[in-house]
C-alpha cells in the first residue's frame, strides 16, 4: 500500500498543476527542486539526481530555528499540489481526494521539521559537547548524538514514505577527543 501511494505521489509531482502549467511543460528552478526534495526525502534509496534538491533544501537556514522550519516549509510548498489526479484513479488504490491532499500536506510539514538528513552520514556529524568542571578545572567532552531526532522518526512513520532508519551501534560515553568514528549505520551493513 505504501509503495502504491508513493507511486501515485511520484506521478502526481511529475504531473502539472493545471492552474500554473500547460500540458507538457516541465517544472524548473525552485519549483522543480521543491518537488524533487519531497520525493527524495520520502525514501532512503536515492538516485544521484537527488543531490541538488537535498542540498538546496538543507541550505535554507535562518537565524532562529522556527524561522528555518517556516522557510523550508515555504520552499516545499512551491511544489504544485493540484495535480489533476481524478477521483477514480485515487479510488483504484483505495484513497480519496481528501486523504491524498491531507497526506501530501502532512508529508510536506513532516519534512519541513527535519533538522538534517536522516542518513548515517548526517547523523554521524551531529556531535554533542559537554563541559565538565571538577576542582576548578574544566574540560570539554564529546560524543556523537545517540538519539534519533523525533522528526526522523515521524518521517519514517508517515504513510507515504519508505524510510529505513539507521541504527546506533556506538558507545554512549563521553570522550575527550572529538569523534571521528562512525556510530550510525544502515541496518543492512
Q: What kind of feature is each model-predicted range?
A:
Residues 21-24, 90:
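Compositionally biased, intrinsically disordered low-complexity segments enriched in polar/Pro/Gly
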Residues 4-14:
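Sec-dependent N-terminal signal peptides
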Residues 81-189:
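Low-complexity intrinsically disordered segments
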Residues 14-22:
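Sec/Tat signal peptide C-region and signal peptidase I cleavage site
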Residues 69-86:
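Alpha-helical ligand/cofactor-binding cores
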Residues 52-74:
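Active-site-surrounding "flap" and adjacent substrate/cofactor-binding loops of secreted or lumenal enzymes
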Residues 26-56:
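Short N-proximal segments of mature Sec-exported proteins
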